[in-house]
Amino acid sequence: MAPKQIFILEDEAILLCDLEDLVSHLGYQLAGSASNVDEAITKLSSGMKPDLALLYLNLNGIASDPVADHLIAAGVPIIFVSGYGTRGLADRFAGFEVLQKPYDEAKLAEALALALRPPE
């Protein structure tokens, strides 16, 4: 079975590289990444359909909501990432997982496994 593909939206280059490495280390494949909303929408609109997306909540003052909406409409599970907990999370995303930065490998591994688990 091919590794699950993860898309990452993160505006800080060093954190993006770290997260890409961590995702690979956990046995997943990087489907793609973006550092801003427009870049993410462009890539995802080109036919890319990852198995899951990790979305940083606040991209230099801009919410990642449009990317989340696009992914949800496409049936792609998402996990939000934030250095500030759920602050800035739109009410409509209240039930979604929010991982706290800095990344904890065990928590990330658990969140990815749960989000990618087939429905029972």
Model segments located where?
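Non-catalytic signal-transmission and effector/linker regions of two-component phosphorelay proteins
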Residues: 1-5, 104-120
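Conserved acidic carboxylate
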Residues: 10
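Two-component/phosphorelay signaling modules centered on CheY-like receiver
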Residues: 13-32
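Acidic, metal-coordinating helix/loop segments flanking the phosphotransfer/catalytic sites
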Residues: 33-52
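Acidic catalytic/metal-coordinating carboxylates
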Residues: 36, 61-66
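Active-site residues of response regulator receiver
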Residues: 56
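Hydrophobic/aromatic residues positioned on beta-strands within the core alpha/beta folds
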Residues: 79-81
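A Lys-centered signature of the CheY-like receiver
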Residues: 101
